[in-house]
Regions:
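Start-transfer (signal-anchor) and selected internal transmembrane alpha helices
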Residues: 1-32, 151-195, 420-427, 534-543, ...
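Membrane-lumen/periplasm interface segments of multi-pass, membrane-embedded glycan/lipid transferases
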Residues: 262-264, 439-528
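Membrane-interface alpha helices of multi-pass inner-membrane proteins
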Residues: 378-395, 400-406
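Transmembrane-helix signature of polytopic, membrane-embedded enzymes
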Residues: 296-299, 318-339
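Transmembrane-helix motifs of polytopic, lipid-linked glycan transferases
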Residues: 169-172, 303-326
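Transmembrane signal-anchor helices characteristic of membrane glycosylation enzymes that use polyprenol
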Residues: 15-35, 179-210, 217-255, 426-444, ...
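Perimembrane helix-loop-helix junctions
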Residues: 363-372, 398-430
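Interfacial juxtamembrane loops and adjacent helix segments
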Residues: 221-304
C-alpha cells in the first residue's frame, strides 16, 4: 500500500478516536462534573410508612403533600416517583435550592405520571434543601427517590460525536464540498436523520403522524385483514406528547409498547379502497412489512418504517444535487432545511411529494439550461413522469408539471414528437388533477351534504363551502389574497416553514437572524462562475404556475378544513410551501448580486447553516439530560 494512502487512513483513524474520546470527555466532565469529578453522589429513598432516610432532617406530611427537608444542601440530579394511580396523573412539586451564587431560590415544577410506565422521572440538577411534593386526589405516593450518580446519556453522547464530526468535516474537508457536494449533503442528512429516528423512538411528534402510521400499517398487509394489538390501537389514537420527557421514561415506554405489541392480538377488516395518496406510503409500508417478516420488536419495526422515508429523501436529494446543472448549492441548501429533514424521519406522505417535485424541477432546469443534447428529451420525459407520480400524494401540486410546456423547441426531433409530448403532459395534468377535482364535483352534483367535511369534526362541509365560494366569488378572492399575503414571509422564510419540528417545537424567533440571511443569501447571491439566471419567459411562466398552485393549496384547505362561510382559511401550514421554494428562488435569480468567495466557502455556508439550525433544534428538543 502507498505510504501517502496509509498516512491518510491513519490520520482519519486518529481523528475518529479523538472525536470519540472528546465526546466521552465532554459527557463525563461537562455533564457529569458534580458526580464524576467532585464525587457528589446521593441516593435518598423515602417510602411512606417506612424509616426516614438518614440524609433527611424531617418528613412533613399534610393532606396530599409530602415535604422532605434535607439536613444540608445536597446535589440531586434526578427524582424518581412511583404512584399508585389508575390513570395519568399530573403532579407538581416545589424545590428550594441554592443557585450557583449560593442564593436560595424556590421553583415550582410540574410533570405527568403514566401508570403504564411504572415510574416517573424528572431532571432536577440542583442543590436541593427542601422538596415539597403535591399528589392529586385519587393517587397515592408509593415512593420518592432523590439521587445523583455518574450516568452516560447515550443520546447526548451520540449527539456530541455527531457535532464534533460535523465540525471536523466543515473545517478540514473543503474538497468534499467542492468535489462531492451530493455525497456530503446526503451523508449529513442520513446521519442527522438516523439520530433523530433513534433518539425519538416510538413517538408521534410529526404532523398527524398517527393517521399516516395507521395507513402505512394497513397497507403493509396488502389490504383486507389487518393484525391488531394493543400497541397498534394506542398508536392510532396517538401517544400523548408528554408520555415521556426523560431518557429513563423513554426506555420504559419502549418496553411497555414492545410488550403490548403481543397483547390482545386479533384481526380486523379494513377497506382501504383506491386512493392515489396511498402511493406516498408504499415505502413506509414496505419497512413495516420487513419488520414483521424478521419478527422485530415493535420499536424497531416502527423505526424501520420511518427509515424508509429517510432513505427515499436521502437518495432523491442526492440525485437532485448531482443532476442540477448550475448552482448546486441551491438544492443542497433546500435539502438541508431543518423542517424537511425532520419530516423525512416521520410517517408522512410529504416526503415522496417533496422529493419528486424537486427532481422534476431539476430535470426541467437541466433541459432549458443545457438545450439540445442526446439525453435532453429523456430528461424532459422523466420530469413529466416524476411530476405526475410525486403529485399523486397531493394533487394540488400537479400544475407544476406545466413548466414542461415551456421548453426549447430544438430538443424535439420533429413536430410530431413535440405534439405527442405536449399531449402526454396534458394527459398527466388532467388525470392527476381530476383525482382532486372530480370527487368534489360529484359530491356537489349528488348533493352530498353533511358527509364530506373534516372527519375530526367542526362545522365543515366541502359541498356547502364550494357553493358558498361560487355564490360570493369576490369575497373569497379578497379573503384568499389577505391570507396569502399575511403569511407569505413567515411561510417562505421564517422558522415556521424552515425550522419547525412538529409537536416538538419551533426554533425561537432569535434564530431568524441567521435563518433569514441564509435563505435570502442563497436565493439572491451567487458566485460569478456559477450564476443561475433563467430567461424572462421562463420566470414569467413559473410565476403564473406558482400562483395557480398557491390558489389550489389555500382553496383545497378552505373547502375541507374551514367552517362554511368562515372569514379565515384553516389548515394551511408552512410546510406546504416547501415544493414552491425552488421555483420561487429561480424566479428571483439575478446576475447583479455576485459574491467573490471560493466555492468551498460558499458551499459550506449553504449546507453548514441549516445543519447548525437542525442541531440546535435537536439539542433543545431531544434527550440531552
Amino acid at each position: 500500500m502507498d505510504m501517502n494512502v496509509l498516512k491518510k487512513i491513519l490520520k482519519e483513524v486518529v481523528a475518529a478516536v479523538l472525536t470519540i474520546a472528546l465526546a466521552f470527555g465532554i459527557e463525563l466532565i461537562g455533564f457529569n462534573y458534580r458526580t464524576f469529578v467532585k464525587g457528589e453522589t446521593a441516593d435518598i429513598l423515602y417510602q411512606p410508612g417506612g424509616e426516614v432516610p438518614e440524609e433527611l432532617e424531617a418528613v412533613e406530611k399534610k393532606y396530599y403533600r409530602v415535604r422532605l427537608l434535607l439536613k444540608e444542601p445536597t446535589y440531586i440530579k434526578k427524582m424518581q416517583v412511583i404512584l399508585n394511580t389508575p390513570e395519568k396523573t399530573d403532579y407538581s412539586f416545589y424545590v428550594r435550592y441554592d443557585n450557583a451564587f449560593k442564593a436560595e431560590k424556590l421553583e415550582k415544577i410540574t410533570d405527568a405520571y403514566w401508570p403504564e410506565l411504572g415510574s416517573g422521572f424528572t431532571n432536577l440538577d440542583k442543590d436541593v434543601k427542601v422538596l415539597t411534593l403535591s399528589i392529586p386526589k385519587g393517587a397515592e405516593l408509593v415512593s420518592v427517590r432523590l439521587y445523583s450518580s455518574t450516568a452516560l446519556n447515550k443520546y447526548r453522547l451520540l449527539f456530541l460525536m455527531m457535532v464534533l464530526f460535523f465540525l471536523y468535516v466543515i473545517f478540514t474537508k473543503k474538497q468534499w464540498f467542492v468535489e462531492h457536494l451530493d455525497w456530503t449533503t446526503a451523508g449529513a442528512i442520513l446521519i442527522l436523520g438516523c439520530f433523530t429516528i433513534f433518539s425519538q423512538g416510538v413517538i408521534e411528534n410529526g404532523w398527524d403522524e398517527q393517521i399516516h402510521f395507521d395507513r402505512a400499517y394497513q397497507l403493509s398487509f396488502g389490504g383486507g385483514a389487518v393484525k391488531t394489538n394493543d400497541t397498534y390501537e394506542l398508536l392510532c389514537e396517538r401517544l400523548a406528547k408528554d408520555c415521556y420527557n426523560t431518557a429513563e421514561e423513554k426506555e420504559l415506554l419502549t418496553q411497555y409498547l414492545n410488550d403490548k405489541y403481543h397483547s390482545n392480538e386479533g384481526t380486523a377488516e379494513y377497506n382501504l379502497g383506491v386512493n392515489c395518496a396511498y402511493t406516498g406510503y408504499l415505502l413506509q409500508a414496505f419497512g413495516i412489512w420487513v419488520g414483521r417478516l424478521f419478527h422485530l420488536s415493535f420499536n424497531r419495526l416502527f423505526m424501520l418504517g420511518k427509515l424508509m422515508n429517510l432513505l427515499l429523501y436521502v437518495v432523491g436529494m442526492f440525485f437532485a444535487i448531482r443532476l442540477m446543472p448550475k448552482k448546486k448549492e441551491l438544492i443542497a441548501a433546500l435539502a438541508m432545511v431543518p423542517t424537511q429533514v425532520y419530516i423525512a424521519t416521520t410517517y408522512t406522505y410529504d416526503v415522496p411529494l417533496n422529493v419528486f417535485m424537486m427532481l422534476g424541477m431539476v430535470l426541467w432546469l437541466k433541459v432549458i439550461l443545457e438545450g439540445k443534447s442526446e439525453k435532453a428529451f429523456r430528461y424532459l420525459l422523466g420530469s413529466v413522469l416524476i411530476f405526475g407520480f410525486g403529485s399523486l400524494a397531493k394533487a394540488v401540486y400537479i400544475p407544476m408539471i406545466a413548466v414542461c410546456y415551456f421548453v426549447p423547441g430544438e430538443i424535439f426531433k420533429d413536430k410530431k414528437q413535440k405534439r405527442l409530448f405536449f399531449g402526454l403532459v396534458s394527459a398527466v395534468l388532467i388525470a392527476v388533477l381530476m383525482t382532486f377535482v372530480l370527487p368534489t364535483l360529484i359530491w356537489n352534483a349528488n348533493n352530498e351534504i353533511g358527509t364530506t367535511g373534516d372527519p375530526r369534526g367542526g362545522d365543515t362541509d366541502v359541498v356547502l363551502q364550494l357553493r358558498s365560494i361560487l355564490a360570493y366569488p369576490l369575497q373569497y378572492i379578497k379573503l384568499f389574497f389577505k391570507e396569502v399575503i399575511s403569511e407569505f414571509g413567515s411561510y417562505f422564510a421564517g422558522t415556521a416553514g424552515l425550522a419547525c419540528f412538529g409537536r416538538m417545537r419551533e426554533l425561537s424567533s432569535r434564530w431568524s437572524y441567521i435563518l433569514i440571511p441564509w435563505i435570502f443569501g442563497t436565493t439572491f447571491l451567487s458566485r460569478k462562475e456559477d450564476c443561475l439566471v433563467m430567461e424572462k419567459k421562463y420566470k414569467l411562466s413559473l410565476g403564473v404556475i406558482l400562483f395557480v398552485v398557491l390558489g389550489l393549496i389555500w382553496s383545497a384547505l378552505y373547502l375541507s378544513y374551514s367552517p362554511v362561510g368562515s372569514t379565515h382559511i384553516s389548515g394551511v401550514q408552512a410546510r406546504y410551501y416547501y415544493p414552491l421554494l425552488l421555483p420561487l428562488m429561480l424566479i428571483m435569480g439575478n446576475k447583479r448580486c455576485i459574491l467573490d468567495i471560493s466555492q468551498s466557502v460558499y458551499r459550506r455556508i449553504a449546507v453548514g447553516i441549516p445543519a447548525m439550525l437542525l442541531i440546535a433544534g435537536m439539542y433543545g428538543s431531544f434527550f440531552m439530560r
